[in-house]
Swiss-Prot record:
It is found in: Cell membrane. Belongs to the major facilitator superfamily. TCR/Tet family. The chain crosses the membrane at residues 71-91, 104-124, 137-157, 162-182, 193-213, 236-256, 266-286, 304-324, 339-359, 363-383, 397-417, 430-450, 507-527. It comes from Ustilaginoidea virens. This is Efflux pump ustT. It is a multi-pass membrane protein.
Length: 537
């Protein structure tokens, strides 16, 4: 491994020299380590651990923009990759966790992630990096839900809050550590090490699971032959659900920004999305025994309430995480790195909230009241974030983030605990996968809604500001750190920054709505204690 890494590094250095000699723009990933694209830095602080590593590396690897796919093609690529990660992985993998040993399924997913890391480490062009990241996404998509499932398999319910709190706190802390490690590796060695480092870590995880986790017998013996085994995994349901959600996401992303709401493209996307969704629901009802989302599971009151709660909190989290960084860069005029540092309050408070939520669950025993506290903090935090302006003091925006982070941390594990109090053990893997699917789905939908709100408000207010010579489309295409370069006097700059501030804070109303809805969903969850729960038959 050391020799391979050294060879990769030498190859990188050789290519850098060729670039200097020929004075050409970089055309492949290997040629890009000495360059920096500020647009790609805008969201690096929003990613956790591994995402932080690779995104930090991506800042050092720009290409000639003429070589990128067009807007439509790029939208389809990114939606396919991101949606494929959590749709193809989360829900169908819940079936794997149900019918096969969670230990071996989890180890296989980690191995797939390692393969993707190896592909990314050896990439000679950006297309190969995309392939590597997609493979990583498939493996990583089932790891989070799988971690919770493994805890459910190996710990009694009354002890799980402590372990889940540690798990969620670790995720929050990794959001800080990941980009820092990625930046250090990219600056002092090579971006390839952001991929290479995952390989020994993944190997260590597999070794620990192999030697220390007891494998539970799966239910694969119920299925006779490959046809029956494949049928158990519900390929029809997955084939209907994936394009349905992609259509919905694209419609929400494009409507009101690229196209009007009555444009035929938007209408067609909603129609196709609706028809595919109906087809998915029908397929689940006709084959309940092999359904990806069994009706008897999702229609259970606590499961449905927990799914909705997870979707709302996930949506609020991604909206705030996405836009608070933009606010720091555009309104407070700081770099992407400084914006990342200023969101530490949000991330650390999530970690503290996760630990406190775990302790509270073990002490109180009932998830619903903690979910209500979580929703209250989220709603209050998001509401306060809507008051941000150009002159907001640091004590205020730090305090607002802490309230938001505590709310997110408090509620992050409660849905997974609640469903275990009402379901049979065989249905728990499916329910937990459904919970994490809801979190990812809610995040994707609400980010699109937030983007739409931002665009609508920004276009309207910028038109009212009447800044001479300023093109609205150009501003929307410009990174948050660069918008100040588009105007040339203080009066116009003040108008532009004020417009941007109002547009960003308008997106926090979306998070506020999600927080209020999560409060309502918590009332659906039954008050059943996690202490000494009798198995459900």
């Amino acid at each position: 491994m050391a020799k391979e890494a050294q060879s990769l590094h030498e190859l990188d250095n050789m290519k850098e020299k060729e670039v200097d000699q020929e004075k050409k723009a970089p055309t492949s990933v290997g040629d890009q380590e000495e360059h920096d694209d500020p647009k790609k830095q805008a969201s690096h602080s929003q990613n956790v651990s591994e995402n932080g590593l690779v995104d930090e590396a991506a800042q050092e690897a720009p290409e000639d923009e003429s070589q990128y796919p067009g807007p439509l093609a790029m939208a389809v690529i990114m939606v396919a990759i991101s949606m494929g990660m959590f749709l193809v992985s989360l829900l169908p993998l819940g079936r794997f966790y149900k019918f096969y040993s969670p230990k071996w399924v989890y180890m296989s997913l980690v191995f797939i992630f390692v393969i993707g890391s190896a592909v990314g480490a050896g990439a000679m062009n950006s297309n190969t990096v995309i392939v590597g990241r997609a493979i990583q996404g498939i493996g990583l998509g089932g790891v989070l839900s799988g971690s919770t499932i493994l805890i459910a398999e190996n710990a009694p319910l009354h002890r799980q809050p402590m372990f889940l709190g540690i798990l969620m706190a670790t995720m929050s802390i990794s959001a800080i550590v990941g980009p820092l490690i990625g930046g250090a590796l990219t600056t002092h060695t090579s971006w390839r090490w952001c991929f290479i480092l995952n390989i020994p870590i993944g190997g260590a995880i597999i070794a620990v699971l192999f030697f220390f986790v007891k494998a539970r017998e799966g239910k694969e013996q119920r299925a006779q032959g490959w046809v029956e085994k494949i049928r158990q995994l519900d390929p029809l349901g997955s084939a209907l659900l994936l394009p349905a959600v992609v259509c919905l996401i694209l419609a929400l992303q494009w409507a009101g920004s690229q196209y009007s709401w009555d444009n035929w493209r938007i209408i067609l996307l909603f129609v196709f999305g609706g028809l595919l969704s109906i087809g998915f629901v029908v397929s689940q009802m006709l084959r309940p025994d092999t359904a990806t989302v069994p009706p008897h599971v999702v229609c259970q009151r606590t499961v449905f309430g927990s799914f909705l709660f997870s979707a709302m909190t996930g949506g609020a989290m991604l909206v705030v995480t996405y836009w608070i960084s933009d606010w720091f860069q555009a309104v407070q005029n700081v770099s992407a790195a400084q914006a990342g540092i200023r969101t530490i309050a949000l991330v650390l408070s999530q970690a503290v909230g996760a630990i406190m939520g775990g302790g509270s669950s073990r002490l109180i025993g009932y998830p619903p009241p903690i979910m209500m506290i979580s929703a209250t903090f989220i709603a209050v935090g998001a509401g306060l974030l809507t008051t941000l302006n150009v002159d907001t003091k640091s004590a205020n925006w730090i305090g607002y983030q802490i309230l938001m982070g505590l709310g997110l941390g408090f509620g992050t594990q409660q849905a997974s605990l609640a469903v275990q109090t009402v379901l049979k053990k065989d249905d728990i893997p499916t329910a937990i996968s459904l919970i994490f699917f809801g979190m990812q789905l809610g995040g994707s939908i609400f980010v699109c809604i937030g983007q739409n709100v931002f665009n609508q408000v920004f276009v309207k207010l910028l038109g009212q500001a009447a800044i001479p010579g300023l093109d609205t489309d150009l501003v929307l295409r410009t990174g948050a750190t660069e918008i100040r370069q588009l105007v040339h006097n203080d009066a116009d700059l003040s108008k532009l920054v004020t417009t941007y501030n109002t547009s960003v804070t308008s997106t926090f109303y979306v998070a506020l709505a999600a927080g209020i809805t999560s409060m309502l969903s918590a009332f659906l969850v039954q008050w059943k204690s996690v202490k000494n729960v009798e198995p459900v038959h």
